[in-house]
Every structure is written in structure tokens, then in C-alpha cells.
Amino acid sequence: MAFPTTSAQQAETNRKILEEIQTKKQLLAGGIINLGLSPANQMPAPQLLGQPTTVNPDFQAGVGIATNATSTARSAFNPTSSTTLGFFIPQDSYFGNSFIPVLPRLEPLPSPATTPTTPNAPPSHNISK
């Protein structure tokens, strides 16, 4: 069972919490804080649009899959890329995805109700009683 705190104690606690939050905000804004991530497992900085991209040397030009990829990834990549309508973009993923599928947008087939009729088509025969 928690004991009720006096308003002075509550105000002091709130002030300390707010000071701590303000300090963390300043550290984050300044880029000084380390979130406990080692350099090996930090995500790369996001690239802004319009900036030139750098090519990862782990990917061979024209081959399409990383040289450090597992044999399972290579064996899945080669037949898949040759038998699909789309193509694959190789990537250096921290999540285990060695390539991203890119599928083309296909126009839907027209339904029979919306198919235009040709002007030279024979008239339909209606039998009336």
C-alpha cells in the first residue's frame, strides 16, 4: 500500500522528472547521447532524397546478390529472378532480407460487361412470343 505524498514532495518529484526529461531532450537534440548501441549494430543514417547514393562494395556489379550472402540466399535468388515477371533489388539488410522483390503493376483484364462492342457485330437474335 502506497503512502500518500504531500504536495511539496509531489512538486519536488515532478520537478526532478521534468529536469531529467529536459536534459535528455537537450542531449538528443545535440546528438551527444549514446543509446547503448555498439557501432557494429547501429542502423546507418537515413539518406535524404536528392543526395547521391553510395554503392556498398559487398555487392558485385551485375551479379545481383551480395558476395557475402549465404548459399541459401543465392540458391533462392537465381531461379526466382529468372522465373518471375518482376525483378529483385539486392540489399545489405540488418534484418536478414538479402533482396527485395519489385513486381510490375499489371492492368486488370476488362470484364465482359465493360467490353465495348464492335459496330460490325451481328445483331443478337431475340425470340419474342
Curated annotation (Swiss-Prot):
Transmembrane segments: none annotated. GO terms for cellular component: nucleoplasm; SOSS complex. This is SOSS complex subunit C homolog. It holds the Pfam family SOSSC. InterPro entries: SOSSC (IPR031821). Belongs to the SOSS-C family. One of its GO terms (biological process) is DNA repair.
